[in-house]
Amino acid sequence: MLHLHILSWVLAIILFIATYLNISKNQGGSPFFKPLHMILRLFMLLTLISGFWILIQSFMNGGANHMLLTLKMLCGVAVVGLMEVSIAKRKRHEQSHKMFWITMALIIITMVLGVILPLGPISKLFGIG
């Protein structure tokens, strides 16, 4: 399940950037916008489902830092929401660059939290998790 989660969020980030850049300020969405947006939503849903599954497994197994897991879950849900809001703002021709960069910063924070959690690579490297 961890591999599905990592694959889905990597593809979601790539699709988010592609979808965001496929909206022109003058002409609106390109012909590729709607399929990209639908595929992005699919991968965001896969990310959320696999993330909740990993969260439930970590809570049941014990030994995990529940506060960091909950914080990462909240950041992940916020990232998905901010992705949708920034794409919607750009589609309505509103100022969306600030929202885009806030979303990217929150993506990085969420990734850092995932790296330091018990299933992350740093925890495995030092034998913590």
UniProtKB/Swiss-Prot annotation:
Database matches in InterPro entries: UPF0344
GO CC terms of this entry: plasma membrane
Keyword Transcription regulation recorded: no
Keyword Lipid metabolism applies: no
Transmembrane portions of the chain: 1-21, 36-56, 67-87, 99-119
Subcellular location: Cell membrane
Lineage top rank: taxon: Bacteria
Membrane topology: Multi-pass membrane protein
Xref: Pfam families: DUF1516 (PF07457)
Keywords: Cell membrane, Membrane, Transmembrane, Transmembrane helix
Major subcellular location class: membrane
Classification via NCBIfam families: PRK13673.1-2, PRK13673.1-6
Assigned protein family: Belongs to the UPF0344 family.
UniProt-recorded name of the protein: UPF0344 protein SaurJH9_0969
Organism: Staphylococcus aureus (strain JH9)
